[in-house]
Amino acid sequence: MTGSVWAIVPAAGRGTRFGGAVPKQYLHAAGQPLMAYTLAALAAHPAVAGIVVAIAPDDADWPGWTAVHAKPLLTCVGGATRAASVLAGLLALPDGVRADDFVLVHDAARPNLALADLDRLLEIGRGDPVGAILAAPVRDTLKRAGDDGGIDGTEPRQRLWRALTPQLFRRHQLIRGLTEASAAGVDVTDEAMAIERLGLRPLLVEGAEDNFKVTTPADLARFEFELANRDRGGASREAERSAMPSAATSVFSGARSAASGSEEV
């Protein structure tokens, strides 16, 4: 299936698990905000028509970008939860996005997305009536903990996967899934969970293990290490990440650069 898709990036969260005054999506790696790499990676795919970023109502860190890779970059006010922010993004999509069009949702603090993974997700997901998510098979041994901190047992890891992003679903089905979950008081932790509650079965598309979410200082250090390797030409997947240069903000335009304050960045 061909055609363009829009992407939604929920970025209204405060990143409390990371700590600090600055939300994690705005923390800098190699001099640029994490979210700059995230948005640049999404917009680099030829099938992505534009991106809606859901930000906090009092967000003073948003750089004011209006385009990335010459594609429109819109904002809307997000909600108190991830699900509320994604729903706000779905409702803020341009009028030309139809109810049955596929839409991508990607974590703001997941900056290491490879173009090849996104390409595979779009190819497989748009060929399915429901959609698909990037995911990685669980490879570690899983232990079930007791209340006292002891091991109560070992869980079989066969057929278990870690959900990654982006996730790809039809706009109207995701709106329905998120709305019904909210009405039922269910806190869905990803978009696939909302779709599953409708009785639908998205596909799993294997993605790279290094498409990780930055949630701790160690994760940030790991991403900076990836960037340093890329600069030295030592990253094995550099060809797949050609749209994510170290100076990620060079592909942005808008009100100001988070790094330089310039009109074009």
From Swiss-Prot:
Catalytic activity as recorded in UniProt: 2-C-methyl-D-erythritol 4-phosphate + CTP + H(+) = 4-CDP-2-C-methyl-D-erythritol + diphosphate
Protein name stated in the entry: 2-C-methyl-D-erythritol 4-phosphate cytidylyltransferase
Record function comment: Catalyzes the formation of 4-diphosphocytidyl-2-C-methyl-D-erythritol from CTP and 2-C-methyl-D-erythritol 4-phosphate (MEP).
UniProt keyword Nucleotidyltransferase, yes or no: yes
Keyword Metal-binding among UniProt keywords: no
Record Pfam families: IspD (PF01128)
GO molecular function: 2-C-methyl-D-erythritol 4-phosphate cytidylyltransferase activity
Annotated InterPro entries: IspD (IPR001228), IspD/TarI (IPR034683), IspD/TarI_cytidylyltransf_bact (IPR050088), ISPD_synthase_CS (IPR018294), Nucleotide-diphossugar_trans (IPR029044)
Enzyme Commission number, as recorded: 2.7.7.60
Site description Transition state stabilizer, residues in chain: R17, K24
HAMAP family attached to this UniProt entry: IspD (MF_00108)
One BP annotation, GO: isopentenyl diphosphate biosynthetic process, methylerythritol 4-phosphate pathway
Gene that specifies this protein: ispD
Coiled coil ranges: none
Enzyme class: transferase
UniProt organism field: Xanthomonas campestris pv. campestris (strain B100)
